[in-house]
């Protein structure tokens, strides 16, 4: 595929960050409404039940999203073929996963959903096929660099989540069931729209291409362990808090996570845009792009973390109310880990783009083991503060391990990878001017 110039890439990044900022605003609005109207106990259950389909999908999605990008960008696979295979996999995996959940519900679902009615758990599980669609088909938009539709899907989902939650809990005086139902409907609607958008790019159907399918699953098997370990690393603390403590503590911790999530949108947006470019580059170019991206991403993330350290405590109590003040301490303890997550997110894209997922897998599994061990030791003793500390330590370990391997393989230096340069800062006005010029050109064309 033809490479886009740097001004266009910056425009993609700024567009994605802008859409993520909208997600943050509406996400905070949704979080504030649910926190204030559901109360800590039901807010905690709401968090676990919404997270459940995400985790189940990560257990079963087989790394197909990363493989879709790799095969379209690196192997030149037909977008329609990849999309058709993805649809077949969505249906097959959903059926198998839901059947497994039904059979094993007392073993691996009930221990983490204590206090939730079985009907609520069943309602949450209806999101599984739509979460799979989101994973597989967003990756196709990412591969073809259609970031406009990619961004709109997320924005629509956030806006309608806020609106439906407001209607369910304010206008209809609903409780937990109404909040859950509203989110399931939004998830379904947003991802049916996503299918329509991909079909506009490349018409697809319910058919299977064995050659592309086998290659996708072989590549995905490597990414699968990486993404599964990464998801569990990021979310297992919620489940362990639910297991060891109570839904109320889950609510406090989830509020702390929600408050710091806006910082992670920086590295996530940049990583999303840079990944297809890395996948289409030579190793030398990929290493150079990665080092530059790491410097800019860390710089922006550190500035955001410093800002949070100064105003985060006051903002949390103003937004969520004084009864959520116990979330302040874990929020502050998370900040060093958030900085290291940003480095981790960029470096994993480099290794995946070069079909070196084994490096990511080793780092993710090692960090997951450390995180799990520390959580089991610290949560019973220190509560949710122990969970925040565990995450900070384990992500620091994972990021440093990836950095060590990246430096060895690329020939870059640690300083050249993580410390912002004067020339980097000097490039901002030029890149912004180029992005602005392209934006004005796009508007002129639209007219």
Language model features with spans:
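Membrane-interface junctions at transmembrane-helix termini in multi-pass inner-membrane proteins
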Residues: 6, 71-74, 130-155, 336-363
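Transmembrane helix-bundle signature of multi-pass secondary active exporters and lipid flippases
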Residues: 50-58, 253-275, 300-304, 334-341
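Membrane-water interface segments that mark the loop-to-transmembrane alpha-helix transition
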Residues: 11-23, 49, 58-106, 115, ...
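Interfacial segments at transmembrane-helix termini and the short loops linking adjacent helices
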Residues: 41, 105-124, 310-339
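Interhelical loop/hinge segments that connect adjacent transmembrane helices in multipass membrane
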Residues: 1-5, 9, 148, 152, ...
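Signature of the first transmembrane helix
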Residues: 7-65, 94, 102, 162, ...
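Hydrophobic alpha-helical transmembrane segments
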Residues: 118, 122, 151-200, 366-370, ...
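Helix-loop junctions and terminal segments of transmembrane helices
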Residues: 27, 60-77, 143, 256, ...
């Amino acid at each position: 595929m033809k490479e886009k110039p740097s001004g266009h890439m910056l425009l993609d990044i700024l567009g994605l960050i802008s859409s993520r900022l909208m997600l943050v605003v509406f996400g905070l609005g949704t979080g504030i409404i649910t926190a204030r109207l559901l109360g800590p106990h039901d807010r905690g259950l709401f968090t676990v039940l919404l997270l459940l389909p995400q985790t189940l999908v990560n257990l079963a999605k087989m790394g197909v999203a990363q493989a879709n990008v790799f095969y379209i960008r690196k192997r030149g696979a037909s977008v329609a073929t990849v999309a058709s295979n993805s649809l077949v996999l969505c249906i097959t995996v959903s059926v198998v996963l839901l059947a497994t959940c039904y059979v094993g519900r007392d073993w691996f679902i009930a221990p983490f959903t204590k206090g939730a009615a079985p009907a609520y758990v069943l309602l949450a599980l209806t999101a599984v096929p739509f979460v799979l669609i989101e994973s597989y088909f967003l990756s196709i938009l990412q591969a073809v660099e259609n970031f406009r539709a990619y961004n709109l899907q997320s924005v629509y989902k956030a806006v309608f989540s806020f609106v439906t939650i407001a209607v369910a809990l304010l206008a209809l005086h609903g409780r937990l069931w109404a909040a859950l139902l509203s989110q399931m409907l939004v998830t379904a609607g947003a991802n049916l729209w996503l299918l329509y958008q991909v079909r506009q790019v490349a018409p697809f159907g319910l058919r299977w291409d064995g050659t592309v399918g086998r290659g996708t699953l072989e590549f995905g098997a490597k990414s699968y362990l990486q993404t599964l370990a990464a998801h569990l690393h990021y979310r297992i603390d919620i489940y362990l808090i639910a297991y060891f403590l109570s839904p109320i503590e889950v609510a406090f911790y989830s509020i702390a996570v929600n408050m710091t999530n806006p910082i992670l949108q920086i590295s996530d947006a940049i990583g999303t845009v840079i990944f297809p470019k890395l996948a289409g580059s030579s190793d030398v170019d990929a290493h150079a792009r990665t080092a530059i991206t790491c410097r800019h991403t860390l710089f922006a993330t550190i500035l955001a973390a410093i800002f949070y350290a100064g105003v985060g405590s006051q903002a949390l109590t103003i937004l969520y109310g004084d009864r959520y003040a116990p979330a302040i301490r874990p929020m502050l303890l998370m900040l060093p880990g958030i900085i290291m997550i940003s480095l981790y997110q960029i470096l994993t894209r480099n290794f995946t783009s070069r079909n070196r997922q084994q490096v990511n897998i080793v780092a993710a599994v090692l960090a997951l083991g450390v995180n799990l061990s520390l959580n089991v030791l610290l949560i019973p003793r220190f509560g949710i503060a122990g969970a925040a500390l565990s995450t900070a330590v384990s992500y620091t370990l994972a990021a440093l391990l990836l950095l060590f391997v990246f430096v060895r393989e690329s020939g870059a230096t640690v300083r050249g990878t993580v410390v912002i340069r004067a020339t980097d800062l000097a490039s901002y006005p030029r890149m912004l001017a180029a992005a602005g010029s392209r934006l004005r050109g796009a508007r002129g064309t639209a007219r």
